[in-house]
Amino acid sequence: MSIKYIASSKLPTPWGVFEMHGFEDSETGKEHVALTFGTFTPDAPILGRIHSECLTGDALFSLRCDCGFQLQTAMQNIAEEGQGFILYLRQEGRGIGLLNKIRAYELQDQGANTVEANERLGFEADMRKYDMIIPMMEKIGVDKVRLMTNNPRKVKAMQSFGLEVVERVPLQVGKNRYNEGYLKTKSTQLGHMMSEHHFTETDPEVDKD
């Protein structure tokens, strides 16, 4: 495994002080981060999330996706729980990178959905891999998880690496008029587990101009 632990530091946030653990992939040069909160109870399932980098949603407040909303909600949920973790993986644009993501957005502006846009650019709908989580989970000392996700691929990935997913915790937040079609495509074509109302009703607070 090419993932190497580098260092840890405190990370004050609006929800409390997390611990930030840095990792480097010597093969790809990518730098991944694990956030932990609180003291983990031995042998207990820990609330957590695998979150792939989304610069537009996480840092630029884009309403085209639900990523930033999911990240903030996950951090808030963990703080309220008193313990938990987030693995922040550098897999922008479901693994195609930032510039290709912008190219995909350009195609979406012309009418393609998120899956069609990736495929027109020559990519699979979802290019992400999750093998880098193995040493990250070992480092933070977690092997039983209550996983915050709507994506069954993340559940299967954890299970395939010998991690026990005790519970899948839905994370259905961030719906608005700009991402309604995106959420529906994630549900109908990518297999994300979302309730019908999540991608058919518009958030009136976001809908105001």
Curated annotation (Swiss-Prot):
- Any Gene Ontology biological process: riboflavin biosynthetic process
Q: In which pathway does it act?
A: Cofactor biosynthesis; riboflavin biosynthesis; 5-amino-6-(D-ribitylamino)uracil from GTP: step 1/4
Annotated catalysed reactions: GTP + 4 H2O = 2,5-diamino-6-hydroxy-4-(5-phosphoribosylamino)-pyrimidine + formate + 2 phosphate + 3 H(+)
Kindly identify the residues recorded as the active site.
D126 (proton acceptor), R128 (nucleophile)
According to the record, cofactor stoichiometry and binding are noted as: Binds 1 zinc ion per subunit.
> What are the recorded GO MF terms, alphabetically?
GTP binding; GTP cyclohydrolase II activity; zinc ion binding
EC primary class: hydrolase
Q: Which cofactor does it need?
A: Zn(2+)
Q: Which UniProt keywords apply?
A: GTP-binding, Hydrolase, Metal-binding, Nucleotide-binding, Riboflavin biosynthesis, Zinc
* InterPro entries cross-referenced by the UniProt entry: GTP_cyclohydro_II, RibA, RibA-like_sf
Q: Please report a single Pfam family linked to this protein.
A: GTP_cyclohydro2
Which residues participate in Zn(2+) binding?
C54, C65, C67
| Residues the record lists as binding GTP | R49, I50, H51, S52, E53, Q70, E92, G93, R94, T114, T149, K154
According to the UniProt record, one GO cellular component term is: cytosol
Tell me which EC number(s) this protein carries.
3.5.4.25
Report the function annotation for this chain: Catalyzes the conversion of GTP to 2,5-diamino-6-ribosylamino-4(3H)-pyrimidinone 5'-phosphate (DARP), formate and pyrophosphate.
The record's similarity note reads: Belongs to the GTP cyclohydrolase II family.
Q: Which named protein is this?
A: GTP cyclohydrolase-2
Q: Which organism is it from?
A: Shewanella pealeana (strain ATCC 700345 / ANG-SQ1)
Q: Per UniProt, what is the name of the gene that codes for the protein in this document?
A: ribA
